[in-house]
From Swiss-Prot:
GO molecular function, one term: transcription cis-regulatory region binding
Boundaries of every F-box domain copy: 54-112
Name recorded for this polypeptide: Tubby-like F-box protein 1
Phylogenetic placement of the source organism: Eukaryota, Viridiplantae, Streptophyta, Embryophyta, Tracheophyta
Gene Ontology biological process: regulation of DNA-templated transcription
Family classification: Belongs to the TUB family.
Pfam families: F-box-like, Tub
Start and end residues of each stretch annotated as Disordered: 386-414
Compositionally biased spans, kind Pro residues: 388-402
Tissue-by-tissue expression: Ubiquitous.
Organism for this UniProt entry: Arabidopsis thaliana (Mouse-ear cress)
CDD domains xrefs: F-box_AtTLP-like
Domain of life of the organism encoding this protein: Eukaryota
InterPro entries with a match to the protein in the record: F-box-like_dom_sf, F-box_dom, Tubby-like_C, Tubby_C, Tubby_C_CS
Name of encoding gene: TULP1
């Protein structure tokens, strides 16, 4: 039996995962009465206990299973063929564990495979090339992964969607993993971005904290999951209230026409992540559905006898994680909500200033062919606070270096995120480490919003 026939047989034995519904039950609800819920699609809810019939493929020897998954990972490297890797991860627990062991994160592999990849940092040595399609009639935005080098393409791997909601005093963009269901009440909701009245400041919210970081470990009590526990929980603040970044646009007090100036304070990413050997702490292992988060918050608040704090503020005043989680020891590296870290400041991004072209009489940036239409929305972000380089020994003579795979050189002006227009309602978005696809998409959404005093 050929390798492809094995994969086809496995896929057929479990059905088409994108169209098949599974009955499931939440283990946390079984303790309170075993209430049943409806059905779900796709593989977004890894926390769900899925009841499927055991197949002979579940009893494969680990050595054979490892060889099968490795060969599949190497052969199916791009979408849409990469859906076979996702299908194999959904066969059973042993297959899923093997896929998690072999399939690397986007930071190492440069590939987006599972939904959790959307919240993990991008590749270090290349850029992840995506494009955004805007629908003005429905006020929606869809993010796709580029499958070809062509700029104006209609096909791509869908990643995220967003919907603009205009309020009296602010604008909100709801971000979802579903192309059509864009709602905060959906299990595919993963975050949002909210602006102030002038459209000069934006706050990016995530649905779940960085529970793998020292924040969660510092306050985790015995008997409660570190994934959902916090020392003080506000039942008035739903999931999606974790502030992970703030985007600010400078006011144009002179009123002259010119490029925008923006800064992004990435509160969940320390500046040390750009140093040699640096990492982004608190990377998620899974994306927790909203229903599980809400249920966990309700169970914690009802059973805990600790003091509960209520936060009714929706403004841009600073609030610290230490106010929510209590005092922390000095040796713990904890990212504060206001954008400070005990041992390392947060990563701050700023737009690369364009140069004035005398012949064209316009401001120009080198997008290396990825942007073709002039627009005030176009920008390139670089690190504003580069870490100090470590002293290095005397270098030995080396041959000529090869060009970077991303087409960009390392150094102080290394572009971390670039966004620009290529056609009507079509924009490119290229990002790299340490930003994730979710963070990059949220930052780009802020550029779409109306700026009353920035240009």
């Amino acid at each position: 039996m050929s390798f492809r026939s094995i994969v086809r047989d496995v896929r057929d034995s479990i059905g088409s995962l994108s169209r098949r519904s599974f009955d499931f039950k939440l283990s946390s609800l079984n303790k309170e009465g075993g209430k049943s819920r409806g059905s779900v699609q796709d593989s977004h809810e890894e926390q769900l206990v899925v009841t499927i019939q055991e197949t002979p493929w579940a009893n494969l020897p680990p050595e054979l299973l490892r060889d099968v998954i490795k060969r599949l990972e190497e052969s199916e490297s791009v979408w849409p063929a990469r859906r076979h890797v996702v299908a194999c991860a959904s066969v059973c627990r042993s297959w899923r564990d093997m896929c998690k062991e072999i399939v690397q994160s986007p930071e190492l592999s440069g590939k987006i495979t599972f939904p959790v990849s959307l919240k993990q940092p991008g590749p270090r040595d290349a850029t992840m090339q995506c494009f955004i399609k805007r629908d003005k009639s429905n006020l929606t935005y869809h993010l796709y992964l580029c499958l070809s080098p062509a700029l104006l393409v209609e096909n791509g791997k869908f990643l995220l969607s967003a919907k603009r909601i205009r309020r009296t005093t602010y604008t909100e963009y709801v971000i979802s993993m579903h192309a059509d269901t864009i709602s905060r009440s959906s299990n595919t909701y993963i975050g949002k971005i909210r602006s102030n009245f002038l459209g000069t400041k934006f706050i990016i919210y995530d649905t779940q904290p960085a529970y793998n970081s020292n924040i969660a470990r510092a306050v985790q009590p015995v008997g409660l999951s570190r994934r959902f526990y916090s020392k003080r929980v506000s039942p008035k603040v739903p999931s999606g209230s974790y502030k992970i970044a703030q985007v600010s646009y400078e006011l144009n007090v002179l009123g002259t026409r010119g490029p925008r100036r923006m800064h992004c304070a990435m509160n969940s990413i320390p500046a040390s992540s750009l140093a040699e050997g640096g990492t982004v702490p608190g990377q998620p292992d899974i994306i927790v559905p909203r229903s599980i988060l809400d249920e966990s918050f309700r169970s914690i608040t009802s059973s805990s006898s600790r003091k509960i704090t209520y936060d009714y503020s929706n403004d841009f005043s600073s609030a610290r994680f230490s106010d929510i989680l209590g005092p922390l020891s000095e040796d713990q590296e904890v990212v504060l909500e206001e954008g400070k870290e005990r041992n390392s400041p947060p990563l701050v991004l700023k737009n690369k200033p364009p140069r004035w072209h005398e012949q064209l009489q316009c401001w120009c940036l080198n997008f290396r062919g990825r942007v073709t239409v002039a627009s005030v929305k176009n920008f390139q972000l670089i690190a504003a606070n580069q870490p100090q380089p470590q002293p290095q020994p005397q270098p030995q003579p080396q041959p000529l270096t090869q060009p970077q795979p991303s087409g960009q050189t390392d150094g102080p002006d290394k572009i971390i995120l670039q966004f620009g227009k290529v056609g009507k309602d079509m924009f490119t978005m290229d990002f790299r480490y340490p930003l994730s696809a979710f963070q990059a998409f949220a930052i780009c959404l802020s550029s779409f919003d109306t700026k009353l005093a920035c240009e």
